[in-house]
Structure formats: C-alpha cells, structure tokens
Amino acid sequence: MRFLGKDQQRCLRRYFVDIAIDKYERVILDLMFKHVRTQSRFLRTLPALTLYEEDAYLDFMPGSRWSGAFVRFYRQLPGVRVISTGFAVTNHLRAAGVDAHFVPKGFDPARMVLQNQKRDIELGFIGRLGSAAYSARRTLLETLAKVEPLEIMRTHTANEYVETLNRINIFISADVGLSEYMAKNFEAMACGCLLLAKRQGRGEEEALGLEDGVNLLLYDDLASLLERLEWAREHPGLAQSIAVKGREHVLARNAYDKLAREISDVVSVPFTNVSSQPWWKFW
C-alpha cells in the first residue's frame, strides 16, 4: 500500500516510473477525482486496474460542477473496473457502460466505539456545510435548528469526533440530493446514535439493509422529519431499541473488515481487457 500526496496524484506517470508494475497482479487506486480526471491516457496503460470511487454522486447531483464528468472520464478507460460506494450511482455508471460494482462506505470498528457516557445532546449533526455540494444539507439543518434544539457541530480530532457522537442521542443525517449514504451515517450508528436519515430511494436502503423503524428512522422532507422526531420522543424505549439494532447492523454490514472482503471479491474476478501499451508511449 502506498500513500500519494497531491503532487504525486496530479502526475501519476512520473510517480510510476520507478515502480515495476508487471510484478503486481492488480492495481487499485483510491485517489481524488479532480487530480486524476485528466490522466486517462496514462491510466489506460495500467493492467488490471480498479478505481475506488466515493464521489461519483456528483455526476448527476443537481447543480454539481462535475455533472457528467465522471461518466466521460470512465468511458475513456475501457477495461477498467470501478468500485462505487452508492447503489444508485453504480447503476448510473453501469447504464453508461462502465464496469461498476457497488461496495458501500463504511467505518473503522476499532475507532468508532460505544463509550459509557451520558448522551446529553438530544439532536446533533457533525460535519461540513460550507461546500456548494452541501447547500441543500445546510438549508435543511439550519431550518430545523430554528424550530428544534439541533446542535450543528464541527470536531477537530478523531477522538473528539467519537466522543461527540457518543454524546448525541439522535443523529440528524441530511444527505439531501446526494443519492447515497455518507460514511458519517454508519459512524453515528456504530457509536450508538439513533439515526434519523433522509430517504435516498432507488433501491439504496434495500441494498444497504436499512429498514425504517427497525434499524433507523427515515424521513422524506422537513415535515416528515419532525413527525419521526416526535415519535421518537413519545416512544423512547422503542427508539433506543432501533438504535441498538442499528449499531448491530452496521457492525455486521459496514465495518471495514466486512467491506474489505467485498472489495477483494470484486478485484479478484479476472480482467478480460488489459492494457497492451507500455507506459513510455505516453511520455
């Protein structure tokens, strides 16, 4: 495993000069799309290549600056396999002819742990709101905060993040317009929060094994969010039971060790189309 800085990601052919690529049976890249999207000519020279993609929801998110960019990029890479973290996103890529496979986002079970402390924050959200991609998230959360005691927070260390999740009773997830569930949903569930999440639809919940009223609560808009919140307050015992089942579910479905097996299964399938052009052709 190798970790690449931004400059190395921006010029992969230079980075790979000293790597005996023929000694590897598989190549898996988990890099920033904005750094690799102009390097399709070089990427086509890497044999048995799999790209791990977490941001392809931006390809069809309303108002996204990257609209259509992911499909255009992957169409330039015939024979390349893509692991996508969204079920609907994976179907979107497949419809465009991309060899895409669904493996959801997850969390480190050794870090995201249940702590024995009081949950003194009734409603909480931890995360960014400044990006244009999160404008709908910001609108929903700020609107909710005007009528409910929602705490919108940022944390600065990994330990602080876990400790704060363990203080939240109900985690308000607002993945509005993203078409998939971000990792923070599963991290919150792993830390014992009751997850109140925006329904993504298009088979996303079924693919993840998420069941409304069983291991999380789902809402469709602000009105239904407020209704589900009121239900949770009126039925604290049932709400706690859902939180417990949610934690059990993500530990079995979204922990890194479980996802590693899924990724291994995807990349172990033989590649039928491998590069036949040497890297030096593209200098």
Model-derived regions, located:
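Nucleotide-sugar donor-binding catalytic core of glycosyltransferases
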Residues: 1-41, 48-208, 257, 280-283
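Conserved catalytic or regulatory cores that recognize and/or transform ribose-phosphate-containing ligands
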Residues: 62, 222-225
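Small beta-barrel nucleic-acid-binding modules, principally OB-folds
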Residues: 162-163, 228, 232
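Acidic, glycine-centered active-site loop in nucleotide-sugar glycosyltransferases
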Residues: 205-216, 228
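Conserved acidic donor-binding segment of nucleotide-sugar-dependent glycosyltransferases
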Residues: 214-223, 231-236
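A charged, aromatic-enriched C-terminal amphipathic alpha-helix characteristic of glycosyltransferases
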Residues: 233-267
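Long, compositionally biased intrinsically disordered regions
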Residues: 263-264, 275-283
